[in-house]
Amino acid sequence: MTASTATALTHVRVFDGERLREPETVVIDGPLIGTDPAGARVVDCQGATLLPGLIDAHVHVRDAATLDRLADHGVTTALDMGGWPPALLDSLRDLPGTTALLRAGGPAAAPGSVQSRMPHFPESSLLAGPEDAPAFVAERAEQGVDYVKIIAEVPGAPGALSQETLEAVVRAARERGLRTVAHASAAAAFAAARRAGVDAVTHVPLDAQLPATEAELTAAESRFAIPTLATMEAVAQALGHLGLDYTHARASVAALHRAGVPILTGTDANNAPGAPASVPHGPSLHHELALLVDAGLTPLDALRAATVLPARHFGLTDRGAVAPGLRADLVLVDGDPLADITATARVRAVWCGGVERAGL
């Protein structure tokens, strides 16, 4: 990485988070996007497109090297959706010149759940009933989490949180001003999470397509979705013999999009031992964008799903767009991703908080 100095990117097309602008000059002035090119190092970006730094709204990160891999692929902000211990996640926050990490800490899960058998899973994350929700949320708030993760499974299934417990976690989080994100990879679990009032559901069903009525309710109740199609595709390939079908996930995204539910990019990238599918950090975000377009989003929709929408829905007011005064999280790609979404993977340069990644 090189030290932050003023840089003027000239003749560059700019996707500002909402639209593609004609070639112009964008100034990187320290950690922010500036306006004055005087004295700046000039980089001619003819033929390239400048994007806001990409946001992966569902990852699992265990070390700084993983953040660097994300950054090298243009992912400048990542949202960890379940990690522990707190000291590890704290050590990965606010590292200069690499991907910025937000985190949920340990998710709320039921005794007997798959999560309960994970190594060193936090005891405080195991909720026997709604009476355990306030203490769980209080502990996460004390740890400084950015949002609360909840595991929603098919109601009544072994190892599933009850509907009352889901609702109690949402209430307790809302009282503390924390957003809630529910894991739900089955159609009935998705509906249970939506009824509980979560802000977002991550994953889409592999067991059945979401009905249009469920998608419409999700939109009417102002929920948003993080489908993680890259992971759903990989899981279906690994466990298709169990009746899991990627076409259900793809059709569910199409239904949510038609209903007007905001769609955010998230990959569930992880390298955890024993995971049903290993999804690589960085490249999977570009694959996710292509899968979203395949599911019916336009390239413009997909780019917004990776930039302005996650910034908006997670309250990240300093990023997600290209405008003076915002954080200089930027990615320069060859080509025009509005014409060909796969252009996002042709990364020429990346800036994280104004610090340029070297060696790309």
Give, region by region, the residue ranges found by the protein language model.
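His/Asp/Glu-enriched, well-ordered alpha-helical/loop segment
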Residues: 250-333
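Histidine-rich, glycine-flanked metal-binding segment
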Residues: 1-7, 13-51
